[in-house]
Amino acid sequence: MCLQIRQSRFFESGLYVDSETLVEKARVFFSGREDSMNILISLGLVVLGFALLVKGADFFVDGASGIASRFGIPQLVIGLTIVAMGTSLPEAAVSITAAFKGSAGITIGNIVGSNILNVSIILGLASVIIPIAVQKSTVKYEMPFMMAVTLLLVLLGMDGKISRLDGAILWACFLLYLYYIYRMTKNGKEEQAADALPLAKSVLFVLLGAVGVVLGSDFAVDGASELARIFGMSERFIGLTIVALGTSLPELVTSVSAARKGNADIAIGNIVGSNLFNILFVVGTSSLIIPVPFNPRFIVDGLMALVVGLVLWFCVRKNYQLTRKHGIILLILYVFYFLYLCTF
C-alpha cells in the first residue's frame, strides 16, 4: 500500500517521463540543434558567396581588361564595357542564378534593393564623410535617365512578369545608354592606357574570376534561400536586404574609400551608372534568358527606388553638391523603408 502511494506521488510530481514524451523531447532538442546548424551553414554560404563574388569580379575585370589591351582594343571601349559591367557583375551573377533556380524574389529584389541601397546608404554615408561634388551632365541627363528607367521597370512588371520582350526593351535602352556614354567620353579627355598584364596572367585571372563569380552566386543564392525558409521570411525580403547589401559591397567600399581620400566627386557618377546597368543589363539579360515573375509588392519597392532617385536629384539640382545634411536625409529615408519592409 505504501509502495503504491509512493508510486502515485512520483507520477503526479512530473518527474516521471514516459517513453513517448522522452522521444518527443529528444526530437525537439535535436531539431533545434539541426536548425541552428542550418542557420550557421546558410550564413557561411552567404558570406563565402559574397567574398567569392567580390574577388571574382575584380579578377575577371582585371584579366579581361588585360586581354583586351593585348589585342589592341581601345581603352575607351574597355572602360565602357568590361570595367563598367564589372561593377554590376555580382548583381548579374546572383540575379541570373536566382532566375534559373526559380527564386524570382531574389532576382528582382537584389536589383531593386541594390539600387535603393546604392543611393540612400552608400551615397548617404559617403556624403556624411565629405560633401560630394556632382557633374552637371550627371544631374541634367544621367539622373533623369536613371529615374525614367526605374519607372520603366515598374511599368513593365505590372503584368506580373518581366518577359523576354520586356528584356529586349531594356537591352535596347542599354545600348542607347552605351552610345550616350561613348559620345560623352569621346568629347572628354581619353585616359592613358595602363600597363597591361601579361597575356597568360590575364587568362588565368579571367578563369579564376569566372569560377569565383559562378560559385559565389550559387552559394549566395542557396544560402539566402535557406535563410528565408528557416526564418519564415520571403525571398523578396532577403533579396531586398541581405543579398542587395552583399552585391553592393564593391560600390560601398569604392565610394566610401573615395570620399575618405577626397575623391568623392566620382562617387555619384559611379552609383548612377551602376543603377542603370543593374536594371538595363542585369534585369534585361536575366529576362531574355528566362522570363522573371514580378511580385506586385515589387511595384512599391520600385517606386521607392524612384523616390530615392528623385530626392537625390532634388538635393543636387541647384548647387551640384551632395552635402552632409543631404546624406542624413538619404540615410533616414532608408531607415523608414527598412521599417516598411519589416512591417509588410
Set out the residue ranges of the language-model regions:
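Hydrophobic alpha-helical segments, chiefly the membrane-spanning helices
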Residues: 9, 21-344
